[in-house]
Regions:
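Residue(s) in the substrate-gating loop at a strand-loop-helix junction
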Residues: 155
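Substrate-binding pocket helix/loop in short-chain dehydrogenase/reductase
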Residues: 111-112, 116-124, 150, 217
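Alpha-helical segment proximal to the catalytic Tyr-Lys
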Residues: 140, 184-188, 245
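Short, small/polar-rich loop/turn modules that mediate ligand/substrate recognition or access, typified
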Residues: 187, 192, 247-249, 255
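Conserved glycine-rich cofactor-binding loop
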Residues: 24, 31-32
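Active-site helix of classical SDR
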Residues: 135, 171, 179
């Protein structure tokens, strides 16, 4: 495991002023899209952020985009030893870990009849098992602090379903169930556990769609537009800061009204 910054260590330093001043946050999958927006928003609100990417180039991009001592780290969330090493390093260098945002995820889409076992397992390993593993790893420092915020990024697909994504839908629904159970376990220790469930967000994936496809999507959305990554980031920051202190075990939809529970 390497960390992209001036050295191969997680940088130390003092977070800036803001609602999250003095806190340390770990954001997985932070090199682009929703993850990059979340990392930027938490840093803007004063947190020292460690954002992860699967490549050195991605980690360096995170470090260059974030202010102050916030930095990027190379991490494969499926690698249990690497996850443990990174969490240990953050706590060792900064003395605490306040916020975990489980954002990293993959898709391996196909119709169920054509889906290979490997495509199912890769998505479950990355989008569900890794979320559990990282959440478990941060519980010890959070319990010691008697304070912590875990925010899991799920998807509207976890509740509405989507053809060609049985693996992705199962993983995201699983994260929502895990979130509720974990929230009941750790609430007495001052730790909240919540989900943010984006709908269709303007990212690299949706930008590859045709104008006709985008028009078809927006017709399903009462607010009449695709969401922005910053919309999701604002929801995460709310749950991570003081405003979300009495909220736990919920899934906050950020979908423009396309799916209403």
């Amino acid at each position: 495991m390497t960390v992209a910054a001036a050295s191969t260590e997680v940088d130390s330093g003092t977070p800036g002023a803001g609602p999250l001043s003095g806190s340390v946050a770990l954001v997985t999958g932070a090199s682009r899209g929703i993850g990059a927006a979340i990392a930027a928003e938490l840093a803007a609100q004063g947190a020292l952020v460690v954002g992860t990417a699967t490549s050195q180039e991605g980690a360096e991009r995170i470090g260059a985009a974030l202010p102050g001592a916030s930095t990027g780290a190379v991490l494969d969330v499926v690698d249990a030893a690497a996850c443990e090493a990174l969490v240990d390093r953050i706590v060792e260098q900064h003395g605490r870990l306040d916020v975990l945002v489980n954002n990293a995820g993959i898709t391996r889409d196909n119709l169920a009849m054509r889906m290979k076992d490997s495509a199912w397992q890769e998505v479950i390993d990355t989008n569900l098992t890794a979320v559990f593993r990282l959440s478990r790893l941060v519980l010890r420092p959070m319990m010691k602090q008697r304070h912590g915020r875990i925010v899991n990024i799920t998807s509207v697909v976890g509740s509405s379903g989507n053809a060609g994504q049985v693996n992705y839908a199962a993983a995201k629904a699983g994260v929502a169930g895990m979130t509720r159970a974990l929230a009941r376990e750790v609430g007495s220790r001052g730790i909240t556990v919540n989900c943010v469930a984006p709908g269709f967000i303007d990212t690299d994936m949706t930008r590859a769609l045709s104008a006709e496809q985008v028009a078809s999507l927006t017709q399903q959305i009462p607010l009449g537009r695709l969401g922005q990554a910053e919309d999701v980031a604002a929801a995460v920051a709310f749950l991570a800061a003081k405003g979300g202190a009495y909220i736990t075990g919920i899934t906050l939809p950020v979908n423009g009204g396309m799916h209403m529970a």
